[in-house]
Amino acid sequence: VAVSRTIYPAADRATALAELRAGVLRNVENLVAQGQLPAGLSLEQYCRRLNIVSGHPDEVAAALQADRILPHATDLIFQFSPALPTVDTAQRMLEQIATQIAPQLGWRSAAETVTPSA
């Protein structure tokens, strides 16, 4: 069972929210027009409503560890949408997922799990 989560790791929560702002508000505008979200909420409130986990990698990992669905998943898919990160920012976030977030969730790279042959 694959589970998808929107995450946005950054140096801190304020940086993550600043980088998320344009993409989230563009998405929210459509959702408000369709009656799926109320108007007038703060950016942080909209991120909570959209289940966007953002902040320092340790904060993101802690939020994911508290997710009651993840223990039942066989696959975990991360996405950055509705944010529109640059290629360099997306690469940085992928590196943070692999080196800081995923290990806190119990993931190990293939290189770490391979037993050397004698």
Regions found by a protein language model. Give the residues of each.
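Glycine-rich, proline-tolerant flexible connector loops at the mouths of alpha/beta enzymes
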Residues: F78-A90
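An alpha-helical appendage that flanks or caps ligand/catalytic pockets
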Residues: V1-D75, V87, A102-A118
